[in-house]
Amino acid sequence: MLHQLTLAEIARALADKQFSAEELTRTLLGRIRQLDPQLNSFISITDDLAIAQAKAADERRANGENGALLGAPIAHKDLFCTQGVRTSCGSKMLDNFVSPYDATVVEKLTAAGAVTLGKLNMDEFAMGSSNQSSHYGAVKNPWSLDRVPGGSSGGSAAAVAARLLPAATGTDTGGSIRQPAALTNLTGIKPTYGRVSRWGMIAYASSLDQGGPLARTAEDCALMLGVMAGFDPKDSTSVEQPVDDYLAALQKPLSGLRIGLPREYFGAGLDSRIADAVLAVVEELKTLGATVKDISLPNMQHAIPAYYVIAPAEASSNLSRFDGVRYGYRCDAPQNLEDLYKRSRAEGFGSEVKNRIMVGTYALSAGYYDAYYLQAQKIRRLIKNDFVSAFAEVDVILGPTTPNPAWKIGEKNDDPVSQYLEDIYTITANLAGLPGLSMPAGFVDGLPVGVQLLAPYFQEGRLLNVAHQYQQVSDWHTRTPAGF
């Protein structure tokens, strides 16, 4: 069945002419139309664009090209600008916004021959951990349709997990690639801050946001990241650092690998069954030659309060551009300019976005800046220092991706703090700018759980290597949700 193939398998099959990119694209578009109404993972389905790109890929292949992503079907989280296609950011504010240009990530993947099947649902302006804040409705987890898929890249995760497509782009500001990957049995990687261009990626928190891939295997993530990564002069936060050969890195044996287990990751709040699954992964990695050491990240306890000052502060600044004047939602019959601003923003933004804008504006206001924003930035530096100390002793840090499996849709709506706590293990990588990866590690009551790996700056290859070697001796990543 074509929909069961991974990206790597698709690349080999297309090279062997087992089927055409157009045939594959039409098959998956049909599957999306048939099954996505159960999931709500797509905001826009780009049939005509996809078929045109697939035909072009087949032509390029007929002319001797043979790139790994040539003709590979993917979709983009709906905050990556796509020329001529709506880019909504999951918000009423941008419901009618059609981007005049491609984001660098989209441009690179398209140039490599990837076929865009559509734009994927997400928490509004990437603010959320459950994909319930989208203007287009909640996304459902294919492993249990009454549960969340995680967020904010929930549409990306649900679509790949349900085998609607082999891989998708996502973004990660506090765990928004890794957490949904864990809750839907996928592999997802957040690269080092500056590794992947943010140009054309609608900003939530500019010092934290980073784009990356979600797929079923580490090998597929390596294929995607190898194209997505690299310096971009259009992005002032992009880093001039050579891109490693991620595919070659997969094959390195793990003998001598030093793994650190932070004691803070295994304390109160962690489901004991997830802890058991994580420790089972550790034992398997030890049989592959890794050694394990207990470490400490003492400032992790301050990560969530620091994050929920810094991220909303940056969001309140970034989202000030959405005022009803140049593009996006505009209220009807404004009385004057002030009325235009107030009503356009009040009507265009959802409640979670407005909450975070208010928190961020408060944290930056005179009299509170030193008490909140400056203190949060000091904590951020302490968290970074903790990682620098830890990586002097170990090569990789390992722990759970989330403290709990997927919760029921609506279950945590009245208690936002409990929802924020689901990101407790992922936020620190964003605050420090480190690369992080989540990979499948088993199931609890039929729901997937993930293991998170963290590495020093620009060591994405090491993360992919560990995940790939583990996936050679495990089969969690091959499990498919019933009905899909």
Curated annotation (Swiss-Prot):
Function description: Allows the formation of correctly charged Gln-tRNA(Gln) through the transamidation of misacylated Glu-tRNA(Gln) in organisms which lack glutaminyl-tRNA synthetase. The reaction takes place in the presence of glutamine and ATP through an activated gamma-phospho-Glu-tRNA(Gln).
Entry keyword annotation includes Transferase: no
Keywords: ATP-binding, Ligase, Nucleotide-binding, Protein biosynthesis
Matching Pfam families: Amidase
Active site: 77 (charge relay system), 152 (charge relay system), 176 (acyl-ester intermediate)
GO molecular function, one term: glutaminyl-tRNA synthase (glutamine-hydrolyzing) activity
Family listed: Belongs to the amidase family. GatA subfamily.
Quaternary structure note: Heterotrimer of A, B and C subunits.
GO annotation, cellular component aspect: glutamyl-tRNA(Gln) amidotransferase complex
InterPro entries documented for this protein: Amidase, Amidase_CS, Amidase_dom, AS_sf, GatA
Enzyme class at the top of the EC tree: ligase
Catalytically driven reaction(s): L-glutamyl-tRNA(Gln) + L-glutamine + ATP + H2O = L-glutaminyl-tRNA(Gln) + L-glutamate + ADP + phosphate + H(+)
EC number, UniProt record: 6.3.5.7
Official protein name in the record: Glutamyl-tRNA(Gln) amidotransferase subunit A
One Gene Ontology biological process: translation
